[in-house]
């Protein structure tokens, strides 16, 4: 795999995907394919418990989708005469498979936002389960209206599901990205850290690795589906998955250990 596109590394069950280099700070079709391939590999590997995606250049997670590539695509479409009525069939975009993998694999996916993440780059992070940003002089968000566009890689759909429709509408219409601290205040990211985002992501990843993979997968499945599932159905699935875990060897062993005082504080904070 071209190291300018992305690199991967696995440490103690945590897979880290590092996007691009100083030569390649933009999303494009090649990076989309490489990212999808890596995510598919890690999703199917039982030895991988957590996946982290981060940037490969100081000050950048990934700038945004390649504008030259988008112009070339738009000109080709114009020449074809193709039209897009509201009811046109949806065929997916460059990063749809990668984002779907982030959401559906039964493992936590963490975006360690190490710098600028605009437009398509930020939209990709919205498909990740956790977003950690490092503090700095850079921007996060959706500026597409400045180019006469709209967020076309899921931003109009995933951001409302993340921060609510009203806040999402304001952010997208304004087209003004936020600094990391303001992004945290608005709910675009979960945390902003003064150190390296990758260090905090690894800390969280190690905490997740201390849990059983079954519980992590079930929790992700339940919470991810909650917004689109009728409450009665969600509660029924929650109870079924709870019982499946409750009778498992791992859960019984941990509960017995807790009763025997071998585990003194099962609810210790991530901040500990």
Predicted regions and their residues:
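Terminal low-complexity tails and localization/encapsulation signals of metabolic enzymes
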Residues: 3, 255-272
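Glycine- (often His-adjacent) and acidic-residue-rich active-site loop
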Residues: 55-97
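Charged catalytic carboxylate motif
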Residues: 30-34, 94, 101, 200, ...
């Amino acid at each position: 795999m071209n190291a300018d596109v992305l690199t991967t590394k696995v440490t103690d069950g945590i897979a880290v995907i590092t996007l691009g280099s100083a030569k390649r700070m933009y999303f494009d079709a090649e990076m989309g394919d490489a990212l999808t391939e890596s995510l598919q590999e890690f999703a199917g590997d039982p030895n991988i418990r957590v996946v982290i995606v981060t940037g490969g250049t100081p000050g950048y997670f990934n700038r945004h989708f390649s504008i030259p590539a988008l112009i070339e695509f738009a000109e080709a479409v114009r020449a074809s005469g193709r039209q897009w009525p509201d009811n046109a069939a949806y065929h997916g975009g460059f990063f749809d498979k990668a984002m779907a993998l982030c959401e559906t694999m039964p493992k936590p996916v963490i975006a360690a936002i190490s710098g600028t993440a605009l437009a398509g780059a930020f939209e990709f992070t919205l498909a990740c389960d956790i977003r950690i940003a490092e503090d700095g002089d850079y921007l996060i968000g959706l500026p597409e209206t400045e180019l006469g566009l709209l967020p076309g890689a899921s931003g109009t759909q995933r951001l409302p599901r993340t921060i609510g429709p009203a806040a999402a509408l304001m952010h997208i219409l304004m087209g003004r990205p936020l600094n990391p601290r303001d992004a945290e205040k608005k709910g675009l990211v979960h945390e902003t850290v003064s150190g390296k985002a990758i260090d905090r992501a690894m800390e969280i990843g190690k905490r997740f690795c201390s849990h059983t993979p079954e519980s992590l997968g079930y929790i992700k499945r339940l919470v991810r589906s909650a917004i689109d599932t009728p409450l009665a159905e969600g509660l029924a699935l929650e109870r079924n998955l709870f019982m499946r875990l409750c009778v498992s060897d791992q859960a019984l062993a941990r509960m017995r250990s807790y009763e025997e005082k071998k585990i003194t504080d099962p609810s210790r904070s991530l901040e500990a």
